[in-house]
């Protein structure tokens, strides 16, 4: 299962890590997702949800 937010669709982003000499190496920034039980179509389901969605009240835990 992809580490993607079920509600907002947030996923990992890629970019460059820059050293002191500005040499670039590829890296990824992960999204802070938690596996929680929420109501989906009236039934409880365990999905990955970003902490931003949890804090803002976009989902209600079961």
Curated annotation (Swiss-Prot):
It comes from the Bacteria. GO terms for cellular component: ribonucleoprotein complex; ribosome. InterPro entries: Bacterial_rp_bL28 (IPR050096), Ribosomal_bL28 (IPR026569), Ribosomal_bL28/bL31-like_sf (IPR034704), Ribosomal_bL28_bact-type (IPR001383), Ribosomal_bL28_sf (IPR037147). HAMAP family: Ribosomal_bL28. Belongs to the bacterial ribosomal protein bL28 family. PANTHER family: 50S RIBOSOMAL PROTEIN L28, LARGE RIBOSOMAL SUBUNIT PROTEIN BL28A. This is Large ribosomal subunit protein bL28. GO terms for molecular function: structural constituent of ribosome. GO terms for biological process: translation. Residues 1-23 are annotated as: Disordered. The keyword tRNA-binding does not apply. Signal peptide: none annotated. Keywords: Ribonucleoprotein, Ribosomal protein.
């Amino acid at each position: 299962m992809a580490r993607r937010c079920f509600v907002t669709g947030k996923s990992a982003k890629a970019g460059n890590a820059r050293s002191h000499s500005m040499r670039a190496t590829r890296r990824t920034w992960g999204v802070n997702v938690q596996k929680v039980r929420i109501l989906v179509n009236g039934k409880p389901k365990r999905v990955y949800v970003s902490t931003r969605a949890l804090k803002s009240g976009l989902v209600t835990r079961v």
